[in-house]
Each structure stands twice: as C-alpha cells, then as structure tokens.
UniProtKB/Swiss-Prot annotation:
Keywords: Disulfide bond, Mitochondrion, Repeat. InterPro entries: CMC4, Cys_alpha_HP_mot_SF. SUPFAM superfamilies: Cysteine alpha-hairpin motif. PANTHER family: CX9C MOTIF-CONTAINING PROTEIN 4 (PTHR15590:SF0). This is Cx9C motif-containing protein 4, mitochondrial. Residues 8-50 form the CHCH domain. GO terms for cellular component: mitochondrial intermembrane space. The lineage of its organism: Eukaryota, Fungi, Dikarya, Ascomycota, Saccharomycotina. A motif (Cx9C motif 2) lies at residues 32-42. A motif (Cx9C motif 1) lies at residues 11-21. Belongs to the CMC4 family. It comes from the Eukaryota. Pfam families: CMC4 (PF08991). Disulfide bonds join C11-C42, C21-C32.
Amino acid sequence: MSSSSDKTDPCKPEACAIQDCLQQNNYNESKCSKIIDNLYLCCKKYYEKNGSDKQTTCCPKFNLLQLKLKQRELGKIDAEMVDSRKG
C-alpha cells in the first residue's frame, strides 16, 4: 500500500534503508555502500523521469547527485571513518 508521501518521495524506502543500515553498523558508511548506491540509482531515475529541476526530500539535488555518482565511478565511494582515539 503506498501513501501520498511515497508518491512525492519515491525514493523514501531507499533513504530509510540507509538510516537503518547506518544505525545497525555504528554509522560506518562503508558497510552501507550498496544501499547508498540503490538510493542514488533511484534518484537518478526520478530525475530522468521528472526533470533535473524537480525536488524530492529523499534525494540530493540534481547537481550534487551528478557529483556523487561521478565520485563513486572514480572509486571515492565512502566517507572515511575518523578514529578519535588517535592524537
């Protein structure tokens, strides 16, 4: 059953899956790479269908999405964890 929110935020399930994954993995982004990729692909499809000027809460703006997709192609996939125990 889809709600009106799902129609305005078609990538909401993917965005929520990222939050769940991050919480389960102590916010280690590298453990959630595939799920993040799924969100970016959903957002890419959203913009292809609706135009780059449209917005949805769950997707980065079109220009930022383009940058993120390019970074992932270049292998710069995940944020790096900072070890706060090191001086």
